[in-house]
């Protein structure tokens, strides 16, 4: 059933993303092959990059709006009556929104990479990329941690949005769920920032004389990446585990409010 829900979500959102993807690719292609000869082409050299920047800005705005709007309208408004009568678990409803948003976010990232390639393909050095890939793939654990941290950070943002909207609708924080969700989102972010700052401060105060901590600090201050890598692995692993913990909290919070505190209009 999750597959059917995701298929429905992808169809409902594709009409917004695909035209922008096409526009970005076309603009990037023409920017990549442009020349500076003639007044008309010189004018295009100014117009095309501006249009591309505006397209990327539009893509970012649409992504944000759809993340909020699809969850709000589809689950927390009148459409929610239909969605919650379907023979599916609440987790499937949450997952369909989450996975679909992830697909479009990573799709947008790939479009950005393709756009940069189309724009600068004449200036790329094969040897530079070959060496870069060799260095990157020589540290598979580091690469995996970076990838997982990227995914979990995006998931963290999405689940925090969902949890904020769930809390806002359950307790009628404001007449507008979006406004209420924004207030809750900022409140949650502030709370975790304060907690994180306190933990870092107390950790520095209590463990500043610890030899292991001092060795890690020295490694991170090194100018040679090979010296930094061991400490960086540990640091990123801790950050990854902490991000996963927050994701679990936000997921449980979202599920609880959809199951027990749903207040449909």
Q: Where on the chain are the PLM-derived regions?
A:
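Short helix-to-coil transition segments within interhelical loops
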Residues: 85-89
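Hydrophobic alpha-helical transmembrane segments of membrane proteins
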Residues: 1-79, 90-265
């Amino acid at each position: 059933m999750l597959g059917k829900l995701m298929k429905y979500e992808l169809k409902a959102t594709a009409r917004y993303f695909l035209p922008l993807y096409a526009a970005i690719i076309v603009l990037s292609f023409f920017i990549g092959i442009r020349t500076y000869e003639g007044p008309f082409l010189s004018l295009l050299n100014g117009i095309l990059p501006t249009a591309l920047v505006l397209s990327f800005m539009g893509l970012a705005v649409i992504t944000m709006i759809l993340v909020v709007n699809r969850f709000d309208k589809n689950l927390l408004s009148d459409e929610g009556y239909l969605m919650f009568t379907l023979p599916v678990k609440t987790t499937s409803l949450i997952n369909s929104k989450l996975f679909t948003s992830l697909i479009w976010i990573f799709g947008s990232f790939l479009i950005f990479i393709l756009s940069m390639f189309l724009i600068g393909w004449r200036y790329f050095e094969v040897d530079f990329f070959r060496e870069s890939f060799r260095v990157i793939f020589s540290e598979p654990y580091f690469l995996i941690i970076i990838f997982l941290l990227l995914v979990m950070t995006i998931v963290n943002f999405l689940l925090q949005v969902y949890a904020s909207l769930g809390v806002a609708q359950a307790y009628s924080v404001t007449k507008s769920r979006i406004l209420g969700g924004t207030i809750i989102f900022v409140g949650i972010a502030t709370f975790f920032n304060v907690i994180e700052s306190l933990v870092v401060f107390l950790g520095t105060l209590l463990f500043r004389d610890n030899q292991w901590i001092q060795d890690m600090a020295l490694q991170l201050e090194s100018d040679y990446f090979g010296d930094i890598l061991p400490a960086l692995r540990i640091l990123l692993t801790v950050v990854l585990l902490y991000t996963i913990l927050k994701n679990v909290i936000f997921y449980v919070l979202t599920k609880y409010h959809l199951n027990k505190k749903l207040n449909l209009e």
